[in-house]
Regions:
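Conserved N-terminal phosphate-binding loop of PLP-dependent enzymes in the Aspartate aminotransferase
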Residues: 1-199
Length: 199
């Protein structure tokens, strides 16, 4: 059976406004944006239609950020999964998802999860604009990142002026015990993507 509070909230919303494009202002969306900013410390919210679109937006933000000094490389982790669009597939660190769909956009590099020396090497090239990672890798298992690796990633991003981006499409919205999984690691990302649990 469904939670009665959830049923009441959904019923109320359906009698008010069932669905509309993100092009139009709606009060519930504004309230949600405010709540997300309050809970995360972020300053802006972008509402899209899917996790892939959220990650695609994060990739664009990183590229725009790096444009000022010709940095366009985005680093993700080996065995990551970031979506099924061409750019998010390029960001996905698994060869099996790359078969049959190339060529991909240039500028994506992969580093092994929990390998601090490899992370240091790739983030110190002067070409990286963003690091996108999942706190728990969910493709092929449930593999949480090592807290020391995550904290070092944040430190390296700050030292090298790289955007730290966290993909919380699978883990966000209370699915790991906190609103977002990154909170359990004591870090403060520049960009957080979310989707499924928010719906």
């Amino acid at each position: 059976a469904c939670d009665p509070d959830w049923v009441a909230a959904v019923t109320h919303q359906l009698t008010t406004l069932g669905h509309t494009s993100n092009l139009y202002y709606t009060e519930p969306q504004t309230q949600l944006a405010k709540l997300l900013c309050e809970r995360t410390g972020m300053k802006k919210v972008f509402f899209g239609n899917s996790g892939a679109e959220a990650n695609e937006c994060a990739l664009k933000v990183a590229r725009k950020y790096g444009e000022k000094d010709n940095r366009d490389v985005i680093v993700t982790l080996v065995n990551s999964f970031h979506g099924r669009t061409i750019a998010t597939l390029a960001a996905t660190g698994q060869d099996r998802f790359h078969e049959h769909f190339g060529p991909f956009p240039a500028g994506f590099r992969y580093t092994p999860a929990n390998d601090i020396p490899a992370l240091e090497a790739i983030l110190s090239t002067g070409k990286v604009c963003g690091l996108l990672m999942e706190m728990v890798q969910g493709e092929g298992g449930v593999i949480p990142l090592d807290p020391a690796f995550v904290r070092k990633a944040e430190e390296l991003c700050r030292a090298n002026d790289i955007l730290l981006m966290v993909d919380e499409v699978q883990t966000g919205n209370g699915r790991t015990g906190t609103l977002y999984a990154y909170e359990q690691f004591g870090i403060h990302p520049d960009v957080v993507t979310t989707a499924k649990g928010l719906a």
